[in-house]
Amino acid sequence: MDATTCIRTKRDSRAYTAVPVPEESLQSILQAGRMAGSSKNTQPCRYVVLRDAKRKEEVAACGQFATPMLAAPLAIAIVLAPGGGAFDAGRAAQNMMLAAWEQGITSCPVAMHDRDCAARELGLPGDHAVAMVIAFGYPESEQSRHRNVPRTPLAELVHQERW
């Protein structure tokens, strides 16, 4: 699918089948994150792959709305090395979610509200921080993939030169 179609049709999914995400797809998703631009090309994003149900449960306990991680066969924590910022993590996350969707794999970003807890559960070095975790999997139903989500008209969002 072309980039514009991928962007327009991607929806967050919170219900997944138990079908595992193939290793080839995982590598493609991770490569998409790696290829994201970063401030001053610092490339601060690191990734922790979570497939084990118990590990996902322990990490999910660090977020307030992290249940999508429990249902997904795969989750990837985006970790920031020193000097990395949310801007860098966001660019990597969007690349990863779009690369997944191109393969029919849905996703849902999850915030880790207790970052110290998440860092402990993931065994991070003291100077690294969890930016977010993304749940990945095949959608439980076709309906969840194709629902129409209304968007604010572009004319209401865009201003030229000044507000």
Which residues fall in each region the model found?
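Acidic, surface-exposed loops and disordered segments
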Residues: 1-163
